[in-house]
Protein backbone atom coordinates (compact mmCIF):
# COMPACT_ATOMS: atom_id res chain seq x y z
CA UNK A 1 0.00 0.00 0.00
CA UNK A 2 1.62 3.24 -1.14
CA UNK A 3 -1.23 5.73 -0.77
CA UNK A 4 -0.99 8.12 2.15
CA UNK A 5 -2.80 11.07 3.68
CA UNK A 6 -1.04 13.89 5.51
CA UNK A 7 -1.62 17.41 6.76
CA UNK A 8 0.42 19.64 4.46
CA UNK A 9 -0.43 23.13 5.74
CA UNK A 10 -2.11 24.52 8.83
CA UNK A 11 -2.80 28.08 9.96
CA UNK A 12 -4.84 28.78 13.08
CA UNK A 13 -5.26 31.53 15.66
CA UNK A 14 -6.35 31.58 19.30
CA UNK A 15 -7.14 34.45 21.69
CA UNK A 16 -4.33 33.50 24.07
CA UNK A 17 -1.69 36.26 23.80
CA UNK A 18 1.27 34.47 25.36
CA UNK A 19 3.13 32.63 22.56
CA UNK A 20 4.92 30.37 25.07
CA UNK A 21 1.58 29.03 26.33
CA UNK A 22 0.37 28.40 22.77
CA UNK A 23 3.59 26.59 21.88
CA UNK A 24 3.38 24.38 24.97
CA UNK A 25 -0.34 23.67 25.13
CA UNK A 26 -1.36 23.57 21.47
CA UNK A 27 1.83 22.34 19.81
CA UNK A 28 3.28 20.29 22.66
CA UNK A 29 6.72 21.77 21.98
CA UNK A 30 9.34 23.62 24.00
CA UNK A 31 9.14 27.44 23.67
CA UNK A 32 12.95 27.59 23.83
CA UNK A 33 13.07 26.03 20.38
CA UNK A 34 11.54 29.12 18.82
CA UNK A 35 13.70 32.12 17.98
CA UNK A 36 12.70 35.70 17.14
CA UNK A 37 12.65 35.90 13.34
CA UNK A 38 13.16 39.66 13.33
CA UNK A 39 10.12 40.44 11.18
CA UNK A 40 6.32 40.55 11.29
CA UNK A 41 3.80 38.40 9.45
CA UNK A 42 0.04 38.08 8.87
CA UNK A 43 -0.73 41.34 10.65
CA UNK A 44 1.50 40.60 13.65
CA UNK A 45 4.58 42.59 14.67
CA UNK A 46 6.60 39.64 15.93
CA UNK A 47 7.29 36.12 14.69
CA UNK A 48 8.87 33.29 16.65
CA UNK A 49 10.14 30.62 14.30
CA UNK A 50 11.40 27.07 14.45
CA UNK A 51 12.01 25.31 11.14
CA UNK A 52 8.92 26.20 9.06
CA UNK A 53 6.63 26.71 12.05
CA UNK A 54 5.83 30.39 12.61
CA UNK A 55 4.21 31.61 15.82
CA UNK A 56 2.97 35.16 15.25
CA UNK A 57 2.26 37.46 18.19
CA UNK A 58 1.83 41.13 19.15
CA UNK A 59 -0.93 41.81 16.66
CA UNK A 60 -1.26 45.17 14.93
CA UNK A 61 -4.67 45.78 16.41
CA UNK A 62 -7.01 48.63 15.47
CA UNK A 63 -10.75 49.28 15.43
CA UNK A 64 -11.16 46.61 12.75
CA UNK A 65 -8.80 43.98 14.19
CA UNK A 66 -9.04 43.30 17.91
CA UNK A 67 -8.05 40.47 20.25
CA UNK A 68 -5.78 38.93 17.61
CA UNK A 69 -4.07 36.70 20.15
CA UNK A 70 -1.52 34.34 18.62
CA UNK A 71 -1.45 32.85 15.13
CA UNK A 72 0.41 29.65 14.25
CA UNK A 73 1.24 28.84 10.64
CA UNK A 74 3.12 25.78 9.45
CA UNK A 75 3.96 24.83 5.88
CA UNK A 76 4.33 21.25 4.71
CA UNK A 77 7.84 21.01 6.10
CA UNK A 78 6.65 22.68 9.29
CA UNK A 79 3.93 20.04 9.63
CA UNK A 80 6.56 17.32 9.39
CA UNK A 81 8.66 19.09 12.04
CA UNK A 82 5.59 19.34 14.29
CA UNK A 83 4.99 15.59 13.91
CA UNK A 84 8.62 14.91 14.77
CA UNK A 85 9.04 17.24 17.74
CA UNK A 86 5.59 17.47 19.34
CA UNK A 87 4.93 15.79 22.68
CA UNK A 88 1.15 15.86 22.32
CA UNK A 89 1.31 12.09 21.90
CA UNK A 90 3.63 9.71 23.71
CA UNK A 91 3.70 7.24 20.84
CA UNK A 92 6.20 8.44 18.24
CA UNK A 93 4.36 6.42 15.60
CA UNK A 94 1.15 8.39 16.17
CA UNK A 95 0.46 11.75 14.55
CA UNK A 96 -0.12 14.60 17.02
CA UNK A 97 -2.56 16.33 14.66
CA UNK A 98 -5.71 14.63 16.02
CA UNK A 99 -4.81 15.88 19.52
CA UNK A 100 -4.18 19.40 18.19
CA UNK A 101 -7.54 19.30 16.40
CA UNK A 102 -9.22 18.34 19.69
CA UNK A 103 -7.60 21.33 21.40
CA UNK A 104 -8.78 23.66 18.64
CA UNK A 105 -12.31 22.32 18.73
CA UNK A 106 -12.47 22.69 22.51
CA UNK A 107 -11.36 26.34 22.29
CA UNK A 108 -14.33 28.45 21.19
CA UNK A 109 -11.99 31.31 20.35
CA UNK A 110 -9.91 29.24 17.94
CA UNK A 111 -10.14 29.88 14.22
CA UNK A 112 -8.57 27.75 11.50
CA UNK A 113 -7.95 29.95 8.48
CA UNK A 114 -6.34 27.28 6.30
CA UNK A 115 -5.65 23.57 6.23
CA UNK A 116 -4.26 21.55 3.32
CA UNK A 117 -4.71 17.79 3.21
CA UNK A 118 -2.43 15.92 0.81
CA UNK A 119 -3.63 12.60 -0.61
CA UNK A 120 -0.68 10.90 -2.25
CA UNK A 121 -0.75 8.12 -4.82
CA UNK A 122 2.54 6.25 -5.08
CA UNK A 123 0.93 3.06 -6.31
CA UNK A 124 0.14 4.07 -9.89
CA UNK A 125 -3.62 4.65 -9.67
CA UNK A 126 -3.49 8.18 -11.06
CA UNK A 127 -2.03 9.25 -14.39
CA UNK A 128 -1.54 13.00 -14.84
CA UNK A 129 -1.99 12.93 -18.63
CA UNK A 130 -5.24 11.02 -18.19
CA UNK A 131 -6.46 13.47 -15.54
CA UNK A 132 -5.58 16.48 -17.71
CA UNK A 133 -7.49 14.97 -20.63
CA UNK A 134 -10.53 14.30 -18.43
CA UNK A 135 -10.56 17.91 -17.25
CA UNK A 136 -10.13 19.31 -20.75
CA UNK A 137 -12.97 17.15 -22.13
CA UNK A 138 -15.19 17.84 -19.09
CA UNK A 139 -15.32 14.18 -18.07
CA UNK A 140 -15.68 14.83 -14.38
CA UNK A 141 -18.56 15.23 -11.98
CA UNK A 142 -18.15 18.15 -9.59
CA UNK A 143 -20.18 21.03 -8.22
CA UNK A 144 -17.09 23.21 -8.66
CA UNK A 145 -17.38 24.75 -12.11
CA UNK A 146 -14.04 26.57 -12.22
CA UNK A 147 -11.34 24.29 -13.62
CA UNK A 148 -7.95 24.97 -15.12
CA UNK A 149 -4.85 23.18 -16.33
CA UNK A 150 -1.47 24.90 -15.97
CA UNK A 151 1.22 23.46 -18.22
CA UNK A 152 4.89 24.04 -17.34
CA UNK A 153 7.74 24.05 -19.84
CA UNK A 154 11.49 23.68 -19.58
CA UNK A 155 12.54 25.53 -22.69
CA UNK A 156 10.47 23.94 -25.45
CA UNK A 157 9.99 20.71 -23.52
CA UNK A 158 6.77 20.18 -21.57
CA UNK A 159 7.85 19.46 -18.01
CA UNK A 160 4.58 18.97 -16.16
CA UNK A 161 0.97 19.94 -15.57
CA UNK A 162 -1.08 21.06 -12.58
CA UNK A 163 -4.86 20.70 -12.45
CA UNK A 164 -6.97 23.08 -10.37
CA UNK A 165 -10.59 22.34 -9.51
CA UNK A 166 -12.38 25.30 -7.88
CA UNK A 167 -11.90 29.05 -8.00
CA UNK A 168 -8.71 30.60 -6.53
CA UNK A 169 -10.84 32.80 -4.27
CA UNK A 170 -13.04 29.99 -2.95
CA UNK A 171 -12.79 28.39 0.49
CA UNK A 172 -12.28 24.98 -1.10
CA UNK A 173 -9.99 24.05 -3.97
CA UNK A 174 -8.39 20.88 -5.27
CA UNK A 175 -4.92 20.82 -6.78
CA UNK A 176 -3.57 17.74 -8.59
CA UNK A 177 0.04 17.53 -9.72
CA UNK A 178 3.08 15.31 -10.19
CA UNK A 179 4.81 15.52 -6.82
CA UNK A 180 7.72 13.33 -7.95
CA UNK A 181 8.46 15.81 -10.72
CA UNK A 182 8.29 18.73 -8.30
CA UNK A 183 10.63 17.03 -5.83
CA UNK A 184 12.95 15.74 -8.56
CA UNK A 185 12.69 12.13 -7.41
CA UNK A 186 12.23 8.89 -9.30
CA UNK A 187 9.06 6.84 -9.24
CA UNK A 188 5.33 7.47 -9.35
CA UNK A 189 3.99 10.13 -7.00
CA UNK A 190 0.83 12.06 -7.84
CA UNK A 191 -0.65 14.33 -5.20
CA UNK A 192 -4.32 15.31 -4.82
CA UNK A 193 -4.30 18.29 -2.48
CA UNK A 194 -7.36 19.65 -0.69
CA UNK A 195 -6.94 23.35 0.10
CA UNK A 196 -9.55 24.49 2.64
CA UNK A 197 -9.92 27.97 4.08
CA UNK A 198 -12.06 29.67 6.72
CA UNK A 199 -15.51 28.03 6.88
CA UNK A 200 -14.39 24.84 5.14
CA UNK A 201 -11.19 24.64 7.19
CA UNK A 202 -13.08 24.98 10.48
CA UNK A 203 -15.69 22.46 9.33
CA UNK A 204 -12.96 19.93 8.48
CA UNK A 205 -11.42 20.28 11.96
CA UNK A 206 -14.86 19.93 13.54
CA UNK A 207 -15.59 16.75 11.59
CA UNK A 208 -12.07 15.36 12.03
CA UNK A 209 -12.52 15.20 15.81
CA UNK A 210 -15.63 13.02 15.56
CA UNK A 211 -14.74 11.10 12.37
CA UNK A 212 -13.46 7.50 12.60
CA UNK A 213 -10.17 8.74 11.16
CA UNK A 214 -8.78 11.75 9.32
CA UNK A 215 -7.85 9.64 6.30
CA UNK A 216 -11.42 8.32 5.98
CA UNK A 217 -12.72 11.87 6.28
CA UNK A 218 -10.30 13.00 3.55
CA UNK A 219 -11.52 10.19 1.28
CA UNK A 220 -15.13 11.18 1.94
CA UNK A 221 -14.38 14.82 1.11
CA UNK A 222 -12.60 13.84 -2.12
CA UNK A 223 -15.46 11.53 -3.07
CA UNK A 224 -18.02 14.23 -2.35
CA UNK A 225 -16.25 16.99 -4.26
CA UNK A 226 -15.07 15.31 -7.44
CA UNK A 227 -15.11 12.12 -9.49
CA UNK A 228 -13.67 11.40 -12.91
CA UNK A 229 -16.20 9.67 -15.14
CA UNK A 230 -16.84 7.86 -18.39
CA UNK A 231 -19.38 9.72 -20.55
CA UNK A 232 -21.71 6.74 -20.91
CA UNK A 233 -24.97 8.50 -19.98
CA UNK A 234 -26.57 11.83 -20.88
CA UNK A 235 -27.17 12.43 -17.17
CA UNK A 236 -23.79 13.14 -15.60
CA UNK A 237 -24.91 11.83 -12.20
CA UNK A 238 -25.52 8.41 -13.77
CA UNK A 239 -22.18 8.21 -15.57
CA UNK A 240 -19.78 5.47 -14.51
CA UNK A 241 -16.97 6.57 -12.24
CA UNK A 242 -13.56 5.70 -13.71
CA UNK A 243 -12.24 2.53 -12.15
CA UNK A 244 -8.81 4.04 -11.43
CA UNK A 245 -10.39 6.95 -9.54
CA UNK A 246 -12.68 4.67 -7.54
CA UNK A 247 -9.74 2.46 -6.61
CA UNK A 248 -7.71 5.49 -5.51
CA UNK A 249 -10.50 6.79 -3.25
CA UNK A 250 -11.10 3.30 -1.84
CA UNK A 251 -7.40 2.99 -1.07
CA UNK A 252 -7.39 6.34 0.75
CA UNK A 253 -10.06 5.04 3.12
CA UNK A 254 -7.77 2.16 4.10
CA UNK A 255 -4.61 4.14 4.88
CA UNK A 256 -3.51 5.77 8.11
CA UNK A 257 -2.66 9.41 8.64
CA UNK A 258 1.07 9.62 8.02
CA UNK A 259 3.17 10.51 11.04
CA UNK A 260 6.86 11.18 11.59
CA UNK A 261 7.65 11.71 7.92
CA UNK A 262 11.19 12.56 6.88
CA UNK A 263 11.83 16.27 7.28
CA UNK A 264 14.10 18.23 4.95
CA UNK A 265 16.65 18.64 7.69
CA UNK A 266 18.37 16.33 10.16
CA UNK A 267 16.09 15.47 13.06
CA UNK A 268 19.08 14.19 14.97
CA UNK A 269 20.75 17.58 14.56
CA UNK A 270 17.65 19.32 15.93
CA UNK A 271 17.40 16.98 18.90
CA UNK A 272 21.07 17.57 19.70
CA UNK A 273 20.46 21.32 19.47
CA UNK A 274 17.50 21.02 21.85
CA UNK A 275 19.60 19.09 24.36
CA UNK A 276 22.28 21.76 24.19
CA UNK A 277 19.79 24.62 24.58
CA UNK A 278 17.42 23.37 27.27
CA UNK A 279 19.19 20.38 28.76
Where in the sequence are the language-model features?
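Structured, helix-rich domain cores that form ligand/interaction pockets
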Residues: 1-266, 270-277
Amino acid sequence: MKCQVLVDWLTFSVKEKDPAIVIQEYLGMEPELFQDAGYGLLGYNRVLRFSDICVCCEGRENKFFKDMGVCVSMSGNGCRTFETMSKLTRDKGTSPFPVLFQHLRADESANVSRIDIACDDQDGYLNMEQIVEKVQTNELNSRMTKRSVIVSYDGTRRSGSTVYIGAPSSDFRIRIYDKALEEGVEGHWVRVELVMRQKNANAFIEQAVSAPSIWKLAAQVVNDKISFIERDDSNISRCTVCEWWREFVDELEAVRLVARCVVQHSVERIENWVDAQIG
